Amino acid sequence: HEHHAHRGPKEIAAIFDASAMTTGAKETAHRILDILTDAEAKAHGVARDQVHFHEVGAVDSIVDIAAFAICFDALCRTYAVNDCIVKEITEGCGTIRCQHGILPIPVPAVVNIAAAGGLRLHMTQVAGELVTPTGAAIAAAVKTKDQLPASCQIEAVGLGAGKRVYETAGFLRVFLLDD
């Protein structure tokens, strides 16, 4: 059983503020953190300043948020990205064991983020959590549209995969489009 540091949003925000990230990357990291904080506060029925992250507060999740923010900021500056289209997010089913016990999938924080951020969840029969609260918060933080253009040119493709193994391929595919 691993023990992760329990940090509040102010401590995590201070880590981002003290970093060498660009202003744009810091703004993105703060947006992601704010979305996570709101979702966790609602899930636990507490005020924002009473939220203490368990999994999210772990160093690896802070690094995930910062790394995404840095890469997204660089992408936006390099390619003059105007919009981020998030059509839907694919989620699994069943339950997951976490710091708070056994929770249904999607976990309450993901449900809260999807509802508040206008994210469409495509529910599948894949047993397991395909969308983490951090992943949902990232999508909600950068989403500006939810529909692809009728026609467009694909300029580049990016693929990413997690560590978990499921019965179906689980990866994120991102397109850089020019319409």
Where do the language-model regions lie?
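Glycine-rich, flexible loop/turn motifs
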Residues: 39, 47-49, 101
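Mobile "lid/hinge" segments at catalytic clefts and subdomain interfaces of large enzymes
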Residues: 77-178
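Solvent-exposed loop/linker segments at secondary-structure transitions
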Residues: 31, 54, 87
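Glycine-rich nucleotide/cofactor/substrate-binding loop typically near the N-terminus or early
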Residues: 1-44, 107-110, 114-136, 149-154
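Conserved phosphate/anionic-ligand binding catalytic regions in large, soluble enzymes, centered on
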Residues: 53-76
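Long, contiguous binding/interaction regions
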Residues: 50, 57, 135
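Broad structural signal for hydrophobic residues in well-ordered alpha-helices, predominantly aliphatic
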Residues: 40, 71-72, 139
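Non-catalytic, charge-rich alpha-helical accessory subdomains
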Residues: 45-50, 62
